[in-house]
Structure formats: C-alpha cells, structure tokens
C-alpha cells in the first residue's frame, strides 16, 4: 500500500477533474438505485466511525525540499545543542581583524603630501608605496646620512695611513689604535643614520618620505588629501589583510566564569545565518563604558565571509547544569496542529518531530524531549517549511 510520503502531490487541475467525475458518478448512482432504507443509512453512518477507530495513527509526513530551495528561501539548519537555556548566552559582537592582519599606516615625518599612488579599495602588496610626503625632515635625515658616510671615509683613510706608518716604525702603536677606534665610531654613526633614513622611508634624493604598506591586502580607510600637511605618526591609510578574522563578543563580568576557552559558539549574522565558532579566549577584566568583558571567538570555517567591522551576535554555549538538557533557537520551534514541533533534516527534506518545550529566554528554547543532541533541525525561516507542510496536507485532503 502506498504511504502518504510516497504519493505525488496532485495538482489543483487534477483535483478539480477528479472531484467533478466523482460528483457525476454519485448523481447517476443515486437516480438508478433510489434512496437507501433507514437501516442502510444507519449502517453507512456507522462505517466511517468504525474505520476511523480501527485506523492506526498517521506517521508524520516528510516535506521534500531540494537543497537549492533552502538557499533561495534562506532556511538555516543547525544541530540541536546539548545544554539548557541557562547554558546559552546571546551576546552582541563585532568582527575584528586578527592581530597582524591589519595595519595602520602613518607618515614617519611631517610635511605636505606630494603624491598619492593608491586609493581606497585598491589591492596592495607588502612594500608598495601608497603616498609620498615632501618633508624637510627627509632632507635633514639624508644630509645626516651623507655627513656620517663622509666622516667614515675620512676615518678609514686616517686609519690606513696610521697603520702604514706604524708598520714602518714611524709612529707608535697608540696612534694607530686611536685611528682604529675613530673608524669604528664613524662606521657606527653611518649605520645609525642609514637605519633612521631607512625606517622613515627617505627617498634616494632626500626630498620626500614614502608611505609604505607593511602587509599585503586591501586599503580599507584613507584619510589623506593631496597637498595637505600631515604630522608625524598621523594615520593616513588602513590596510586589511586577506587572512582570518575573529569575532569579539561582549559579556558581563558575572558571565565570564561560565565561559571557557575551547567551548562551542555560534556566530549569528545580521541576516540570521549561523556560523560555527569556537571560543579562543576570555579576557579576565572588563573595560569600556559598558563595563563588559571580551570573549574572542574564531570561526571554524576560515572562509566564513565575515567582514571586519560587521555587527553580529554570538550564542555562547556554557556548561549545562543538566546533562540531559537540550536547546535550539526559538525560531526552530513551530506549532503544527496544536503541538510544538521541530523540523528534522532528512536526505530529501524535513520531517516534523513533536518536542516538549521548557523555558524560553534570549531567543533560545529549551527542549526537554523529542530530539537528540546533534540532530540537524531547521532554525531560521522554519515557518516556511511549516507552510509547505500545511499546503501538502491541504492538497491531500
């Protein structure tokens, strides 16, 4: 016998045609056979009741939904979490760059912006020149470098002469050693001046200072104008690398003791899409006007698509007081025919499962029974599956 799940859902034109044919057959039979007797009427009325009493309870229907529809309808699927409502914290968070993957780029000397070679949104490589600053300090550093080099050349010639005279027995050893010490000092001064000029990115002609990106990435901020005067260490560009990002969630000081590094977390995007994450660290102190502690969460998927500065939410899973408790996002629980259900993912779609719901708090519902931890259930936009199931049930009727 073909079950409900195996039947193809008929189209509305087919249903209308079948209904019309049944009406004609019934009308002809009524005319040909006449009205039934009273005993027959009683027997016919009792037959449906007897059939209904003997029929077994219908199994939950499965709604067949292709994977392409899930993406188009923005339906999210998440595992049932182990732990009750009290073991889940919903905290505001923001996406930040991992230390070392973002650079604030400033001018090393004061001056006027001579040239801008990169603009906002451009991709850059490590060592690329973003701008040139015409600076008197650059000329001073270049001159100091040349003076130090000239003194070193003079000290080298003096040492060579004193060394030759000492070997000929003309001058004592003390004068040769003094010349050698003077040469060492001059060479150290050359190295110092060259290091200062190199750190400031002084050009070869000594007229300008180059603003250079230390990392590869993309320019995400630009606060420089051609011809404008800039002060030393003033931010001109900001470059974000293409590396991993982290999510910084903010919790109260009382909640920090409930969160441990390595515990599971769920990152909830602005559109409701969930991303699996893991707690990397919890700051032991609070800071800021909100007096909140920071919980650092890293996405499990390195290619998560998170953008630095994006606002998100994080569900932090703490240790549950009841080992048998479970929880799901509140959107996952739907009311179907007067009962609370969740839609469990199957190979071809979803199947409703009746659940016993406990408390609800912070967008999370506690599940007392009906499912097992780890089962994949529909969360965001689960009501669309309910609508499809109601539609399928109406078509079957």
UniProtKB/Swiss-Prot annotation:
<keyword id="KW-0104">Cadmium</keyword>
<keyword id="KW-0813">Transport</keyword>
<dbReference type="InterPro" id="IPR005695">
    <property type="entry name" value="Co/Zn/Cd_resistance_CzcB-like"/>
</dbReference>
<dbReference type="GO" id="GO:0046873">
    <property type="term" value="F:metal ion transmembrane transporter activity"/>
</dbReference>
<dbReference type="GO" id="GO:0005886">
    <property type="term" value="C:plasma membrane"/>
</dbReference>
<dbReference type="GO" id="GO:0015679">
    <property type="term" value="P:plasma membrane copper ion transport"/>
</dbReference>
<keyword id="KW-0175">Coiled coil</keyword>
<keyword id="KW-0170">Cobalt</keyword>
<dbReference type="GO" id="GO:0046686">
    <property type="term" value="P:response to cadmium ion"/>
</dbReference>
<keyword id="KW-1003">Cell membrane</keyword>
<dbReference type="InterPro" id="IPR032317">
    <property type="entry name" value="CusB_D23"/>
</dbReference>
<dbReference type="InterPro" id="IPR006143">
    <property type="entry name" value="RND_pump_MFP"/>
</dbReference>
<protein>
    <recommendedName>
        <fullName>Nickel-cobalt-cadmium resistance protein NccB</fullName>
    </recommendedName>
</protein>
<keyword id="KW-0472">Membrane</keyword>
<keyword id="KW-0105">Cadmium resistance</keyword>
<comment type="similarity">
    <text>Belongs to the membrane fusion protein (MFP) (TC 8.A.1) family.</text>
</comment>
<comment type="function">
    <text>Component of the NCC cation efflux system that confers resistance to nickel, cobalt and cadmium.</text>
</comment>
<feature type="coiled-coil region">
    <location>
        <begin position="137"/>
        <end position="195"/>
    </location>
</feature>
<dbReference type="GO" id="GO:0060003">
    <property type="term" value="P:copper ion export"/>
</dbReference>
<dbReference type="InterPro" id="IPR051909">
    <property type="entry name" value="MFP_Cation_Efflux"/>
</dbReference>
<keyword id="KW-1133">Transmembrane helix</keyword>
<feature type="transmembrane region" description="Helical">
    <location>
        <begin position="10"/>
        <end position="30"/>
    </location>
</feature>
<dbReference type="GO" id="GO:0030313">
    <property type="term" value="C:cell envelope"/>
</dbReference>
<keyword id="KW-0533">Nickel</keyword>
<keyword id="KW-0614">Plasmid</keyword>
<dbReference type="Pfam" id="PF16576">
    <property type="entry name" value="HlyD_D23"/>
</dbReference>
<keyword id="KW-0812">Transmembrane</keyword>
<keyword id="KW-0997">Cell inner membrane</keyword>
């Amino acid at each position: 016998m073909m079950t409900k799940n195996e039947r193809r859902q008929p189209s509305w034109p087919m249903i209308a045609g079948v209904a019309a044919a049944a009406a004609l057959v019934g009308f002809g039979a009524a005319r040909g056979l006449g009205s039934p007797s009273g005993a027959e009427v009683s027997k016919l009325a009792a037959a449906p009741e007897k059939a209904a009493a003997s029929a077994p309870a219908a199994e939950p229907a499965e709604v067949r939904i292709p994977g392409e529809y899930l993406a188009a309808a923005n339906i999210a699927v998440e595992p049932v979490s182990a732990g009750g409502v009290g073991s889940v914290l919903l905290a505001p968070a923001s996406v930040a760059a991992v230390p070392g993957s973002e650079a604030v780029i400033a001018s090393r000397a004061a001056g006027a912006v001579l040239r801008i070679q990169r603009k906002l949104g451009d991709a850059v490589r490590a060592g690329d020149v973003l701008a040139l600053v015409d600076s008197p300090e650059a000329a001073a550093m270049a001159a100091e470098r040349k003076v130090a080099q000239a003194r070193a050349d003079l000290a080298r010639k003096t040492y060579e002469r004193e060394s030759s005279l000492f070997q000929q027995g003309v001058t004592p050893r003390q004068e040769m050693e003094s010349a050698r010490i003077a040469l060492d000092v001059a060479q150290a001064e050359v190295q110092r001046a060259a290091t200062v000029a190199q750190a400031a990115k002084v050009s070869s002609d000594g007229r300008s200072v180059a603003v250079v990106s230390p990392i590869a990435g993309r320019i995400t901020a630009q606060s420089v104008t051609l011809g404008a005067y800039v002060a030393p260490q003033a931010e001109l560009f900001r470059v974000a690398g293409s590396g991993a990002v982290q999510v910084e969630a903010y919790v109260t000081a009382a909640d920090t003791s409930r969160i441990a590094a390595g515990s599971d977390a769920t990152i909830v995007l602005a559109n409701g899409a969930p991303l699996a994450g893991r707690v990397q660290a919890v700051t032991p102190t609070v800071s800021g006007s909100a007096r909140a502690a920071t919980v650092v969460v890293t996405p499990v998927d390195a290619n998560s698509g998170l953008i630095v500065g994006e606002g998100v939410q994080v569900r932090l899973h703490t240790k549950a007081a009841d080992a048998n408790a479970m929880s799901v996002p509140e959107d996952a629980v739907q009311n179907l025919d007067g009962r609370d259900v969740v839609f469990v993912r199957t190979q071809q779609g979803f199947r409703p499962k009746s659940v016993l719901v406990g408390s609800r708090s912070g967008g999370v519902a506690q599940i007392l029974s009906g499912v097992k931890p780890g089962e994949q259930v529909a969360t965001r936009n689960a009501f669309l599956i309910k609508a499809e199931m109601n539609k399928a049930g109406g078509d079957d009727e």
